[in-house]
Amino acid sequence: MKKEINYLFDVDGTLTPSRGIMNSEFKKWFINFACVNNVILVTGSDRNKTIEQLGESVYKKCKRVYNCSGNDVYEKDTQIKYNDWELPIDVKQWLNFKLEHSPFTLRTGLHFENRTGMVNFSIVGRNANTQERKEYYEYDCKTNERIKIAEAFNKKFPELQAKVGGETGLDIFPVGCDKGQVLKDYDIDSVKFFGDRCDPQGNDYPISKLLKPTSVYHVKDWQHCWELLKNV
C-alpha cells in the first residue's frame, strides 16, 4: 500500500516573499494542490500574520497550521496546542547590548516581538519597510551578523536557542521548542518539507536535519517552490 504523503511548508520566503503576501496565481494553484494533498504549514509567525500573508482561503485548506514554530497550533479555526514562554530579563539585556552596538545603525522600532512560545529579535526592527529590510538583508549577507549573534547567544545561553529566520530576524526559544517539534506528530518517512532556511543556523534546519535529504526541498524563493511542486 502506497504511503500517504504529508507536504510540510515553511511560509515566509517559501510560499510568500519575505513579510509579503502570496502571489495570486500561485495562491490559486496552491489551493487546488491542497484540495487533493495533505498540506501542513509550519511558520515562525503568529496566526494573524500567517493569514495576512496567505489569506484565509489558503490557511483553512491546510490540514494543520503550526504557528510560532509549533507552539501555537490550529486546525481550521480550532486551537489544539498553546505553549507560551517569556524571554528572561538577563537574556533581553544581552540582546539589547547587541542591538546598541551593531554597526548597522538604522533602527525602525519593534526589535523584540513576543510570539507564543518564542521571541523574534531584529536589529533593524520589525517596523522596517521593504527597502529598509533589503538594506539590512544585504548588510547581513556580507557580514553574517545574525549568524554571529546566534552562535554567541547559543554558547552564552545553552538552555535556549537562537535561529536565523526570514531576512532580518532571529527566532529565540527554549531548547526543543523549535520547528523540529512538529515532526513528533507524523511518520517521518511520510513527510516532504519545503523551506528556505535549511542551513544549520536557519529556523528550518531543525526539521531538515531530521529528514532524509531526498525529503527536503531547500528553496530559494516562492517561485522556486512552485517550480519544484509542479514536478513532485
Each model region followed by its residue ranges:
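Alpha-helix C-terminal capping segments
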Residues: M1-K2, F30-V36, L54-S57, F97, ...
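Asp-based phosphoryl-transfer active-site loop
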Residues: K3-I21, L41, L183, D204
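Short glycine-/acidic-enriched loop or helix-start segments at secondary-structure transitions
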Residues: S18-R19, T50-Q53, K76-D77, T130-Q131, ...
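Conserved acidic, metal-coordinating active-site core of Asp-based
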Residues: T105-K192, C198-P200
